[in-house]
Amino acid sequence: MDLRQFLMCLSLCTAFALSKPTEKKDRVHHEPQLSDKVHNDAQSFDYDHDAFLGAEEAKTFDQLTPEESKERLGKIVSKIDDDKDGFVTVDELKDWIKFAQKRWIYEDVERQWKGHDLNEDGLVSWEEYKNATYGYVLDDPDPDDGFNYKQMMVRDERRFKMADKDGDLIATKEEFTAFLHPEEYDYMKDIVVQETMEDIDKNADGFIDLEEYIGDMYSHDGNTDEPEWVKTEREQFVEFRDKNRDGKMDKEETKDWILPSDYDHAEAEARHLVYESDQNKDGKLTKEEIVDKYDLFVGSQATDFGEALVRHDEF
C-alpha cells in the first residue's frame, strides 16, 4: 500500500472512530468567504486586502513599506492582465480574486502532480494515476482492510474521463485539477451529483428519499431522541429539497441542494475595486490606477489605517 492509500485509509478510519451520532455531514458546496472581516471601507480596507490577495498573503503586505507594497502590487497587476492589453477588466479581476481565494486547491494539485506524473512529461495519463494510486493494493489486496479498491478505481476512472475534455485519457494540469476538485468546474458538476447520489441512494433506485437523506447525515444511536437539527433537516427536505413533492429527490433536485447558486462575491468585489479605482471612468483599470490606490488593494505598514504589525490575534 503506497503512502496515499495509507493516508486515505487512516483518515477514513480516524473519521469513523471519532464520529458521533449527532454530528452532521455537510455535502453542500459553497463558495468560500472572501474574508471574515467586515466590509466597511470607511473603517478599514482589511476585507478588500483579504479578497484581493487571500488572507495569508494579505498578512505579508501589512509588514511592507508603501514603496515595497507598490512594487509587489505592480508585479501582481501584470499577472492579472491576462490578455496583456495594458488594462485590467472586471472579469480579469474577478478571475484573479477567485484564484487568490482558491490558492490552496492549486497547491494541492501541485503536490499530487509530482507523485503522479511518473514520466515527467508534464501530463498525467490515466495509467500513471492508476498505477501510482492503486497499483500495489490491486496486485496484493488485503482482504481485511474493508475497502473495495476495484470499485473505487472504477469510480475514479469515470471521473478522470469526465475531466479529460479531449478524451485521450491524458490529463493536462487543468484537467487534473478538475479531476481532483470537480466541484470547482461547471462541466464536472454532473459527476459530483452522480457520486453524491450513489453514496446516499442505498436502495439504488436512482433517487434519494427522506430516510436516505437523513441517514447520510445522522446515525441514530439506540433510544436517544433525534437532535433538533435532524428535525429541521426533515422539514427542509419536505419543504424545499423535494420540489415536486414526490417524496424523493431526483438528479436536478440533488444538484440544487449540493451545488446551490450562490451570490458571486468575487464579481461583486471586482466591481467594487474597479469603481473605487477607475479615475477616468472607462470601466477598466490601468496599472497606474491600481498602484495609485495600493492602500485599497494590498495595504502596507503605512496605510490610511496604519497597521504596522500583523495582528496575530485576529487569525
UniProtKB/Swiss-Prot annotation:
InterPro entries: EF-hand-dom_pair, EF_Hand_1_Ca_BS, EF_hand_dom. Residues 1-19 form the signal peptide. Ca(2+) 6 binds at residues 278, 280, 282, 284, 289. A motif (Prevents secretion from ER) lies at residues 312-315. Ca(2+) 1 binds at residues 81, 83, 85, 92. Its main location: endoplasmic reticulum. Belongs to the CREC family. This is Calumenin. The lineage of its organism: Eukaryota, Metazoa, Chordata, Craniata, Vertebrata.
